[in-house]
Curated annotation (Swiss-Prot):
Main function: Plays an olfactory role that is not restricted to pheromone sensitivity.
Pfam families per record: CD36 (PF01130)
Gene Ontology CC annotations of this record: cytoplasm; plasma membrane
Principal localisation: membrane
Disulfide bond positions: C245-C310, C274-C330, C312-C319
PANTHER family noted in UniProt: SCAVENGER RECEPTOR CLASS B TYPE-1 SR-B1 (PTHR11923), SENSORY NEURON MEMBRANE PROTEIN 1 (PTHR11923:SF69)
Membrane topology of the entry: Multi-pass membrane protein
The name this protein goes by in its record: Sensory neuron membrane protein 1
Any one GO BP annotation for this protein: sensory perception of smell
Source organism (scientific name): Aedes aegypti
Residue stretches spanning the membrane: 106-126, 437-457
């Protein structure tokens, strides 16, 4: 925090940033509570084209299907201001609306085959963490799947994403009832009727509460603007083996403090992945003709970064591969997060799956950011979710699965400000800065001219009566040389050749050349002095 910066300071009422605070009535507060435009939310799914081969331990082959385009609306409600702590408390709601017009030719009715998120997810986690329960869970899974014959799910795309896949929990057998009860308590399924549940990727989250947040408003310290204080009444997480990994670092990603520099990271904390991610400065950029800063994200390599060992299951031996993050502690399922198509990740991950084609343009994470105002003008947050698959030991159906990280889908959440918003940024910030700069230089120029003119006027007033003694030659003619070119106006010498009184007016060129010394010159002319023309030339 640079609270000692004279530009930033701690004055909450400083005019240059009072509209950026999350104080009631400010423009920023209204936009923070409800973004006035939807974010673009795109989903890409990976269809496994050879599930039978994979069930026998073969190499998976996938084909990407997408994008399925959604509007994502973010709204914060039930807001409470705490003046003493300078915090804002709110509940977040995310709403996704399918846009078939922007998804064409895709409709959501396409059939897709993927590793079964529910079956494999549950069995793999039990095998990893609670192996003693494997017989009970395996028996219950066989009953509700009636019976279990494969580790893959073939279903309609929109059922998988939002509408839901039916899970039969009508059996009264103990293992089946225990399994269904566990799935419900974990929030993996939602009730459909008395005997069935529904499972989907996003259905449970659509239009529902996404947690109770507390963030700083930035009134007392603008550099704290938007910083997460607590989530669901917890001031830190409790899922990693290390305090640093459990901290909330940064904002909720919809707002950032102003006056950042290229040395700062853009930090944001996300409950969807239970960790903070920091984007680093990547260079200068332009957006809509405006100068910007370009920030990029790197997931790093936890194995070779001791400060990130708290994200490892058993460091340094069991850590997520380079360019990935282990989401199992957060999601309760063997899910690995990465950039799409394993871009910027361990090459071994890409080699283990056919059909992936990573490239920077489509798969990197970026932000075009205006540092002074803290405004992201164009951004794409991209994350791929893959399942960490391995053989289920002693299982007749799932015992031959390969050990592989198999992509399920990836999501892109982004927005690019249109002309309405970039023009507002241009006229309120950039042109404002240019106007301020122009005013500053205009003030300097006018001040300089004023000094010169003022000096000239003072010079003129104080030199109205100067006694001049012309230097005569032996024959009575005026002296030539340096003094010959000097203009003297007033009375002519008297008949006795004595002195006369005449004002001396310097040229504009002389004034400009000597403007810095005008106060000294003027001081020397407080009263009339008897000087010769030659002396005046030498003096001025």
């Amino acid at each position: 925090m640079r609270t000692d910066d004279p530009v930033i300071g701690n004055d909450g009422d400083a005019p240059r940033y009072k509209n950026l605070m999350l104080k009631p009535g400010t423009q920023m507060r209204g936009m923070f509570e409800k973004i006035p435009f939807p974010l673009d939310f795109k989903l890409y799914l990976f269809h496994v084209t050879n599930p039978d081969v994979v069930m026998k331990g073969g190499k998976p082959r996938v084909r990407e299907i997408g994008p399925y385009f959604f509007e994502e609306w973010k709204e914060k409600y039930d807001t409470v201001d705490n003046e003493e702590d300078d915090t804002l408390t709110f509940t977040l709601k995310n709403t996704w609306i399918f846009r078939p017009d922007l998804s064409k030719p895709l409709t959501g009715d396409e059939m897709i085959t993927i590793p079964h998120p529910l079956i494999l997810g549950a069995l793999l986690m039990v095998q990893r963490d609670r192996e003693a329960m494997m017989p009970l869970v395996s028996k219950g899974m066989d009953i509700i799947m009636n019976p279990l014959t494969t580790g893959f799910l073939t279903t309609r795309v929109m059922d998988l994403l939002f509408d839901g896949i039916l899970i039969d929990c009508s059996s009264h057998e103990f293992s089946a009832k225990a399994l269904c009860s566990g799935l419900e308590s974990e929030g993996a399924v939602m009730p459909f009727n008395e005997t069935h549940f529904k499972f989907s990727m996003f259905g449970l989250k659509n239009g529902t509460d996404a947690g109770r947040w507390v963030v700083y408003r930035g009134v007392k310290n603008i550099m704290d603007l938007g910083r997460v204080v607590s989530f669901n009444d917890e001031t830190e997480m409790d899922i990693y083996d290390g305090d640093e990994c459990n901290r909330y670092i940064g904002t909720d990603s919809t707002i950032f403090p102003p006056f950042l520099t290229t040395k700062d990271k853009l930090w944001a904390w996300s409950p969807e992945i239970c960790r903070s991610i920091g984007a680093e400065y990547g260079g200068k950029s332009k957006y809509a003709g405006l100068p910007m800063s370009f920030f990029k994200l790197d997931f790093g390599d936890a194995r070779n970064e001791p400060e990130h060992h708290c994200f490892c299951r058993d460091p340094p031996d069991i850590c997520p591969p380079k360019g990935t993050i282990d989401l199992a502690p957060c999601l309760g399922a063997p899910i690995i997060g990465s950039k799409p198509h394993f871009y910027d990740s361990d090459p071994k991950l890409l080699a283990a799956v056919d059909g992936l084609t990573p490239n920077e343009k489509d798969h990197d994470v970026y932000i075009h950011f205006q540092l002074l105002s803290g405004t992201p003008v164009s951004a794409a947050k991209r994350l791929m979710f893959s399942m960490e698959i391995e053989p289920i030991r002693d299982h007749a159906v799932l015992g031959n699965l390969p050990t592989v990280i198999l992509p399920l889908f990836w999501a892109e959440e982004g927005a690019s400000l249109n002309k309405t918003w970039t023009n507002q940024l241009k006229y309120t910030l950039f042109l404002g800065l240019r106007f301020n700069t122009a005013v500053k230089w205009l003030t300097i120029i006018i001040g300089t001219i004023g000094t010169i003119v003022g000096g000239f006027m003072h010079y003129k007033r104080t030199t109205k009566m100067v006694n001049v003694t012309p230097v005569q030659s032996v024959n009575g003619s005026s002296a030539k040389g340096k003094g010959a070119g000097m203009t003297v106006v007033g009375h002519q010498p008297d008949s006795k050749g004595g002195s006369v009184t005449a004002p001396v007016i310097p040229s504009a060129k002389d004034l400009l050349q000597n403007s810095r010394n005008l106060p000294t010159v003027i001081e020397g002319l407080d009263k009339p002095q008897k000087v010769t023309v030659t002396e005046m030339q030498e003096r001025y």
